[in-house]
UniProtKB/Swiss-Prot annotation:
Family label: Belongs to the bacterial ribosomal protein bL31 family. Type A subfamily.
UniProt-recorded Gene Ontology molecular function terms: rRNA binding; structural constituent of ribosome
One Gene Ontology biological process: translation
Species of the source: Mycoplasmopsis pulmonis (strain UAB CTIP) (Mycoplasma pulmonis)
Descriptive protein name: Large ribosomal subunit protein bL31
InterPro entries assigned to the protein according to its UniProt record, in alphabetical order: Ribosomal_bL28/bL31-like_sf (IPR034704), Ribosomal_bL31 (IPR002150), Ribosomal_bL31_A (IPR027491), Ribosomal_bL31_sf (IPR042105)
Any one GO CC term of the record: ribonucleoprotein complex
Family matches, as Pfam families: Ribosomal_L31
Subunit record text: Part of the 50S ribosomal subunit.
Coiled coil: none
Gene3D superfamilies given in the database record: Ribosomal protein L31
Keyword Ribosomal protein set for record: yes
Keyword terms, alphabetized: Ribonucleoprotein, Ribosomal protein, RNA-binding, rRNA-binding
Role, per record: Binds the 23S rRNA.
Length: 69
């Protein structure tokens, strides 16, 4: 078996940037940044309010209707 080829595992604290919940894990990385976690994600919390994202075609149709009026 070769020595010193394995990654060094260290304790790491991950903090969600949305709800500021922190998780303690063991990882070979120095830092991990997450935007959303299971504590604040709508799928896990049961929040079913979905914001409809307006697409490029919808934006174009609105501009076209304004110009025609």
């Amino acid at each position: 078996m070769q020595k010193d080829i394995h990654l060094k595992m260290e304790p790491l604290k991950i903090t969600c940037s949305t709800c500021f919940t922190s998780f303690d894990i063991v990882s070979s990385r120095k830092t991990i940044a997450i935007d959303i976690c299971s504590k604040c994600h709508p799928f896990y919390t049961g929040d079913r309010t979905l914001a409809k994202a307006t697409g490029q075609i919808d934006k174009f149709q609105k501009r076209l209707q304004k110009k025609q009026k």
